[in-house]
Amino acid sequence: MKATFGSGGGTHKQVVNGDPFDVPIVQPPYQDVIDSGNVVKSSEKPLATVAVGVAVKQGAPKPDISSPEAVKKMFASAKSISYPDPKGGAAAGVTVDEMFKKLGIADQVESKLKRAQGGAGAMKMVASGEAEIGMTFLSEMEEPGIDVVGPLPKSAATPTSLVAFVSAHAKNTDGAKALLNYLSSPEAAAAYKSQHMMPGR
């Protein structure tokens, strides 16, 4: 089996464009993926959800992120904030931008933002001290030298879903179905949990 990894936005475009995948995994919104005819609509299977979390430099005080108001206060007091650049296709970055708009603080925080190449890049900025606060998916917070504060509250930032399909162009349909069933199995659920994801929708 060959696994191909990419940004959420990049993978999404590849599936819509008809690139060869047997079991593509995408994130909402994905109606255009279904409309493209490149996936079997009836095969849709929710795998897991992952929240955007907050990290600080190791040993730094951990801010309160228990509510949207607390999150707004954190951003107001922070001198610099790193997160994955949504223009690079980073789904976590899209979620963060949506949160800024939802909280009504997009203009206020703009001058503090440091948009990084992917989640790993955002965490490197935190570890080095270049950014006081960093955000990306909890599953991407593996950089040495950071402390994970925790997930943003759902009322501030909606967790992102991972949804899989069987490709309409799969060379081995039975094999693709078997893989999809495994990816939604209890064994796979344990793997998702180990990476700070919640199985299911």
Predicted regions and their residues:
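Exported/periplasmic ABC-transporter solute-binding proteins
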Residues: M1-D19, V26-G37, K45-V50, V56-R201
